């Protein structure tokens, strides 16, 4: 999707901010409502941002104070009326604002934020310097028209609440200037392009909003508590989350609006219809009161309802800017509450001008008053109240969604804080470990350098001794001319020895470097070999354990086999002895048999022996095990003994 081009100039009617306002440089001198701004106020609504002061607030008696900067948001209406509203912001909130803007506009370059500095240092000079830096930084930031119109800046400055307070001041001025006491509706002041502006909720820490009136008193948010200075606020009044206060206030107003609209709808459907006279209507309007104020003036019901319907229509316009859809029902909530209060107040505080023959309805409302309406206006009022009821229900649902989203964001923030703490601990541990490793490496290098210096010192000492010997020999050669040749030869030899020593020194130094490099390489190789040996040692230990386990299992099996073989041999020995005994007995029986015995007995013996052989052969063919065969043979022999 093609991105829209940035706006060309300010007050072009395309600002998505509440009331279609645009940023303007702050005026140099403040003169209350009649302050002169550096532009033509007839071009539209304008706002400016200044940071006039800072304050120190503490959460408890024993805790350290927290620095809050007073951000003053001033608004000028097209009539030239200036209003101011202040909010408290911490330095971290400005840093978060810059981070949110960078995420929203990744291709845009931003002015650098003031440095954070030391957390514990909170001198007045440093805080005053930071206040000035923050004010200049905000001016540079808002000089960009695209940033000044962004949702992030509107949420940070709470322009929605500032616009509401400005509208209230303008309404108050209009009501004071009009003699008939008719107040201007909030919807008539809303810019056409910002009718559906989203209800922006601030999420910049524990900040507190204060509204500055003409007298300079500050009031916290929507509360009725008034203080002469925000520095004297208590903890509960100053550090309460403005989002939670806004949620509670909106939910209570939604519930009240729902109950009121439901009651009016039920009474509109069920109230009796009759004809009244003009005198009775005048008596009602004269004695009718609401919230302790008597009704005055005469109005036309048709004109009032038409005016309120148009006001409802203007409040239901939804803006098409991105990121405003989620909170569009919040504006409907505000519009519904304003329209409801304006309709009821205008109906109750006005008199009816009806004829004697008009059929009217009777409706009782809170405040011991009655509404007298023409019969044909009942359906219109019923539709208006149903629409307001639906808007209130939608607003209540959206408020519950906002509460759930706020709780979710709080949980995510706590999780990220814990994650950051863990990462900080891990970073400190890593730094300590790296520091220890570096110190150990430096110690090793220092030892090697010290050793090399000692070697160099020894070589220098030897060289110096040889030079002394050479000089002494040269001095002795001048005394004797006869030994000159020998001295010269000795000096040459000494020079040669010195050159050889120098060469040897160079060789030793070069060899030392080579040995050092080789030792490092050998150390690396040894480290790798040690690691491989450790791995192989572990593998060998595992294999040895496995071999020992297999050996023990094999020994157990071998022992079992030996026991089985011994049992088999013993059984065979017994069988063999039984067979010998049987054979001997058969021989004795054969010799004792007489020749005259009947042939039948011989045939029986031969049949028994044949049956025995057949049974043995059958068992061998079937492949029984030896133990079963021996048991069977014993059984057969027992049968033979019995026979």
Curated annotation (Swiss-Prot):
Cytoplasm listed as a keyword: yes
Ribonucleoprotein is among the record's keywords: no
Annotated spans, Disordered: 1-26, 172-239
One Gene Ontology MF term: phosphatidylinositol binding
Entries under PROSITE patterns matching the protein: PX
Phenotype of null mutants: No visible phenotype under normal growth conditions.
Coiled coil: 389-440, 491-543
GO terms under biological process: protein transport
Regions of compositional bias (Acidic residues) in chain numbering: 224-239
Entry-linked SUPFAM superfamilies: PX domain
Low complexity bias: start-end ranges: 194-207
Entry GO CC: cytoplasm; cytosol; endosome membrane
Domain of life: Eukaryota
InterPro entries noted in UniProt: EREX-like, PX_dom, PX_dom_sf
Subcellular location: Cytoplasm, Cytosol; Endosome membrane
Keyword list, A-Z: Coiled coil, Cytoplasm, Endosome, Lipid-binding, Membrane, Protein transport, Transport
Bilayer topology: Peripheral membrane protein
Domain PX: 47-164
Basic residues bias locations: 1-11
Name of a matching Pfam family: PX
Segments of skewed composition (Polar residues): 172-191, 209-220
First-listed, main subcellular location of the protein, grouped into a coarse class: cytoplasm
Function per UniProt: Acts as an effector of RABF2A and RABF2B. Involved in vacuolar transport of storage proteins. Regulates membrane trafficking to protein storage vacuoles (PSVs). Binds specifically to phosphatidylinositol 3-monophosphate (PtdIns3P).
Name of the molecule in the record: PX domain-containing protein EREL2
Biological source species: Arabidopsis thaliana
